[in-house]
Amino acid sequence: MSLETTVLTFKLSNTFEEWVKMFDSSEIDAFHKTVGLTPLYRGKSLIDPKKVIVIHQAEEGLAKHVFSDPDTIKNIESGGHIYSTTKITSWVSD
């Protein structure tokens, strides 16, 4: 399997600062390590501060699998991520 870079964009129901506290928490760090996701970047739009981008790297197909799991969806929504607004694109270098 090759390494895949996954770009997620989505809207927040809370502020970016509130969401970042959750995303940068030790619990979410442990989750990323357990499932094999490496976060590379997270940021907010200059135009719309409730629009977020997150870039992960993982084995090909892993991020889409993780982010389609109902338990994962429930957990990320509890942190302010509006899942229905999520757009996922995947990128490879080979």
Range-by-range predicted roles:
Residues 77-79:
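Short, exposed beta-strand-loop hairpins at the edges of beta-sheets
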